[in-house]
């Protein structure tokens, strides 16, 4: 949940990942999820949140009817995941990408997992804040969040360094036998010949494979346009596309109805 100022406008946006975690004996997950959706929608409506986004549900049709009842509309989205169990991630890389990674290493690029009190973490947060400054849906505001995440056993923050400077970073979560990449940012233009984005993603994939995780899911592969450089970049690592719904609720009713008609008629 974050606020964004785009003069002369200011708005709030909330992004919810997944339907939550339930005890193994729970059978009525969709009913519980519907209560959560109603409660969070009412709360954010009072806070004048411009739009709410829900993504990465466990199945495409999970909660469909309940989300519709609460004023949400779906947009077809492409979800990408890499399998880490049948082959090593290196075997899935095309030769061109292998060469890029080799060149980056030869030129001095190194990847590491950063600690909560390290200068590398502060550099990584600064890099993400700069990288996402013109991307309203991915705004990075508070470094305290990342300091907290860096202490969690379920999260790792990777940093690609060159001459003691962080030139690429990503944030990954680990849960239920799978890995999830949340944020990815790099200085790909300033350090083009070091391929910082590629090296950062590769470092996270390699770590997840070495730790025995089955899949790496990319939580945001970009907007669902026919030509999407971010999606093509991620697919280059040997991943697969799976269609899913991403749900939205817009505070202004007529805009929400128009968007629903535009994407679903």
Where are the language model's segments positioned?
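A conserved beta-strand-loop-helix scaffold within acyl/acetyltransferase catalytic domains
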Residues: 1-5, 56-193, 223
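Aromatic (often tryptophan-rich) hydrophobic motifs at membrane interfaces
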Residues: 2-3, 11, 22-26, 34-42, ...
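Acyl/amide activation-and-transfer machinery of modular secondary-metabolite enzymes
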Residues: 10-21, 75-81
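Short, polar/flexible loop-turn hinges at active-site or ligand-entry regions and domain interfaces
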Residues: 23-30, 87-92
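Divalent metal-dependent hydrolysis catalytic cores, especially in the metallo-beta-lactamase
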Residues: 48-56
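Short secondary-structure transition/capping segments
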Residues: 64-66, 123-127, 228-231, 254-258
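Membrane-proximal basic amphipathic "stem/tether" segments
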Residues: 248-265
